Amino acid sequence: MPVNRTIRAQSPGEFRLMSYGVNAYSKVSAAKEVPPRELEAILLMKGAAKLEAVKREWETKKDLTEALAYNRKLWTILVSSVTDETNPLPQNVKRDFSNLAIFVLQSLISLAAEPAVDKVNCVIDINSQIAAGLRA
């Protein structure tokens, strides 16, 4: 049986914090309705889109650092998930994905040290191809 409670904010700032909490919960609840493979595909495409945006502003390299950080974090999480011992994927798939993740992460590090459009294109292509495979 649900418990009804009235929560009163002691200050306007506290009310905003409660609102942020409700909004965050709503976003997480909505995300739970997306199948995991589709969510991974969406996140990979978001990473590709961030890098595409950098390409459009290549002369200034606007948002390069943020795009690289997003993709590094994403690939770190993906490889951690895939290689987890509780993941039911076959060992050869885990190994192959790990090798791909190492390549992508090295490409991102190289891109941070020496920015080049061909390196950006490589990561965009990999993100897009993996996303397409997840959606197939």
Regions found by a protein language model. Give the residues of each.
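N-terminal intrinsically disordered, cationic/polar leader segments
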Residues: 2-77, 83-84, 90, 94-136
